[in-house]
Design a protein with these regions (language model features):
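Charged, solvent-exposed interaction patches on well-folded alpha/beta domains
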Residues: 1-47, 52-58, 62-264
Length: 264
């Protein structure tokens, strides 16, 4: 009996084709596994209780406004870079980081800009300076910061008043003793203390067009005045009384000029 290879091959192909159709049909009708979605959003704000410029609720609202709040969205559709860029537009955010983990969590980590000085200028401008001497808008934030008042434009605030503030804040004594910096029309600097009913005048700040030298120049000048003032506090006011003088002028190197309080 002669074996029919052609017929056998056709039968084999038919069987294979049929099996493929069955498998393909079964696969087509099998319910697809759902794409993983974001089950949790973790928002971590560094120094939230200390600075308080932004809250997790405000971050959520900002992302919802842009329709990019990730909760319940498919993980593959969540763009971490877009979230970072959106939050980075806030004037109170310093750095942002967003990433996804396999458990369905989207992590958002932010650092806030650190305010160091509040400016309330005579021209009506009201804003903060941060630790990089950049301007921050006014907000609901409240803190025990030194306030700078008077004839201050934004350039002078960033390039000179900021260095006065940072010098005061660098000292445990002066950051608690001085509550206000006042800039006179001729750019002379007055300091208002917390203890003692007097005004301190330290003179006009030294100026330079060299940006890299400016901070050291102002810092050295202010520290020299504060060192002399602290000695006067210790050896003068401690005996004469904290409220004897209404005005203390430490502008000049070789003398301290005091104006007695008018008791009438």
């Amino acid at each position: 009996m002669r074996f029919n290879w052609k017929k056998t091959l056709l039968i084999t192909l038919d069987v294979a084709l049929g099996a493929y159709i069955v498998v393909a049909f079964a696969s087509f009708n099998k319910p697809k596994e759902e794409a993983p979605v974001c089950k949790k959003v973790s928002i971590d704000i560094q120094d939230e209780t200390t600075n308080g410029f932004i809250t997790a609720a405000e971050i959520k609202a900002r992302l919802q406004k842009g329709n990019i709040y990730p909760l319940n969205k498919r993980m593959r559709d969540i763009n971490a870079r877009t979230i970072e860029e959106t939050l980075g537009l806030s004037p109170f955010v310093k750095t942002t980081q967003c990433y996804k983990t396999q458990d369905g969590t989207v992590h958002i980590y932010l650092t806030q800009r650190m305010p160091t000085l509040r400016i309330k200028a005579a021209n009506g401008e009201d804003y903060y300076l941060d630790d990089d001497n950049r301007i921050m808008p006014n907000s609901h934030y409240t803190s025990d910061l030194i306030i700078a008042t008077g004839h201050i434009n934004k350039w002078f605030a960033r390039n000179y008043v900021a260095h006065v503030g940072s010098t005061l804040m660098a000292s445990d004594f002066w950051k608690n003793q001085i509550v206000q910096i006042n800039v006179l029309p001729d750019y002379g600097i007055e300091l208002v203390p917390r203890v003692g009913n007097h005004i301190i005048y330290i003179g006009q700040l030294p100026q330079t067009s060299y940006v890299n030298d400016r901070k050291k120049l102002v810092t050295d000048y202010v520290n020299t005045k504060l060192d002399r003032l602290q000695k006067f506090y210790k050896y003068g006011l401690a005996q004469a009384g904290w409220n004897k003088y209404s005005y203390i002028n430490v502008e000049f190197d070789n003398q301290i000029i005091c104006k007695k309080r008018n008791l009438n």
